[in-house]
From Swiss-Prot:
The chain crosses the membrane at residues 124-144, 145-165. GO terms for cellular component: membrane. It is a multi-pass membrane protein. It is found in: Membrane. PANTHER family: (RAPE) HYPOTHETICAL PROTEIN, UPF0496 PROTEIN 3-RELATED. It comes from Arabidopsis thaliana. The keyword Magnesium does not apply. The keyword Metal-binding does not apply. It holds the Pfam family DUF677. Belongs to the UPF0496 family. This is UPF0496 protein At3g48650. Its main location: membrane. Keywords: Membrane, Transmembrane, Transmembrane helix. InterPro entries: DUF677.
Length: 277
C-alpha cells in the first residue's frame, strides 16, 4: 500500500506540472507575478554596498550605479495595478466556483442515489477532485511567492479534475467495504479543511504584497531628490530602507511558503496513509 501511496503522489505532482502549461489563465498569472517581482528585486540588486566601499570615486559619481537602479524601479510605476488584480481574481473565482459547483453536484447525486453506495462514492470522488484542484492551486501560489522573491520552488500547479477522478476511482475499484468508505469520507473532509486553509494563506500573501507597496511608495518618492542632488547621505537612506523592507518581505514569504508546503506534504502524501491504517 505504501507503494501505491507513493505512486499516486508522484502522479499528482506530474499532472500539476503539465496542467500549469495547459491552463492559459494560470500561466498568464504566474508569468505576470514573476515579472513584477523580478523588476521589484532591482532594488536588492543595487550596487550600493560595493559603491560604499569604493574609494576611487568621489563627489557626485560615487553612487551612480545605485541611483540608476533606483530610478529604473521608480519608472516602472504601479507593478500590481488593475491588470494584475484582475488576473488574481479570475484565478481565485474560477476555482472557488469549481469547489462550490462540485459540492452541489455531490449533494444532488446523493439525493438521487440514497441507497446506492457505489454511486454515493462516485459523488465523493468528484468532489475530492475539485477540492484537490483548489488545494494544489493555493499551494502553488504560495510556492510562487518564494520563487519570484528567492527563486526556489516551482513544482506544483493546478491539476485537472479528470485524472484525479480516475485515480481515486481506481483506488476504490478493489474496495467495497464500509471501512474504506468511511476512510475516504474522512479524507475528503480533511481535504476540504486544508483547501479553505490554503485560500486564507493566499489572502495573507496578497495582503503582504499590498503592505510592501505601501511601505516602498514613500521611498520611491525620494528617488527624484536623490538623483537630482546626488548627495551621499540621501542615497544611503533610500538604499538602506529599500533593502530592509525587501528583507522583511523575503522573511515573511519564506514563513508563508513553509506553512503552505507543510500542508501540501500532508495533503498529497500523508493523507493517503489512511489506507495503511
Amino acid at each position: 500500500m505504501a507503494a501505491l501511496v507513493e505512486f499516486i503522489s508522484d502522479r499528482v505532482l506530474s499532472s500539476c506540472k503539465s496542467a500549469c502549461k495547459e491552463d492559459p489563465k494560470l500561466r498568464s498569472y504566474i508569468s505576470a507575478l514573476r515579472e513584477r517581482m523580478d523588476k521589484l528585486m532591482e532594488i536588492k540588486r543595487s550596487p550600493f554596498e560595493r559603491e560604499s566601499r569604493d574609494t576611487d570615486f568621489g563627489g557626485n559619481n560615487k553612487y551612480a550605479g545605485t541611483l540608476e537602479k533606483l530610478n529604473k524601479v521608480k519608472a516602472l510605476g504601479d507593478l500590481f495595478g488593475d491588470e494584475f488584480t484582475t488576473q488574481y481574481k479570475a484565478i481565485y473565482d474560477e476555482h472557488q466556483m469549481l469547489l462550490n459547483k462540485s459540492h452541489h453536484m455531490q449533494l444532488e447525486h446523493e439525493k438521487k442515489h440514497k441507497n446506492d453506495k457505489k454511486s454515493k462514492r462516485l459523488g465523493y470522488i468528484f468532489f475530492a477532485a475539485a477540492l484537490l484542484s483548489v488545494l494544489a492551486l493555493w499551494i502553488y501560489l504560495g510556492a510562487v511567492s518564494l520563487v519570484v522573491a528567492a527563486k526556489v520552488v516551482i513544482e506544483v500547479a493546478t491539476p485537472s479534475i479528470a485524472p484525479l477522478w480516475k485515480w481515486v476511482t481506481e483506488i476504490l475499484e478493489d474496495s467495497e467495504s464500509e471501512i474504506a468508505y468511511k476512510k475516504l469520507t474522512d479524507l475528503f473532509r480533511s481535504m476540504d479543511k486544508n483547501a479553505n486553509l490554503n485560500i486564507e494563506f493566499a489572502k495573507t500573501f496578497k495582503s503582504l504584497v499590498e503592505t510592501l507597496l505601501t511601505r516602498i511608495k514613500p521611498i520611491l518618492e525620494t528617488v527624484d531628490y536623490a538623483v537630482e542632488q546626488r548627495e551621499e547621505e540621501t542615497v544611503k537612506l533610500v538604499s538602506k530602507k529599500s533593502l530592509r523592507i525587501l528583507k522583511v518581505l523575503l522573511t515573511k514569504s519564506r514563513k508563508l511558503v513553509q506553512m503552505w508546503l507543510g500542508v501540501a506534504k500532508w495533503s498529497l502524501r500523508e493523507e493517503l496513509m489512511f489506507w495503511n491504517t
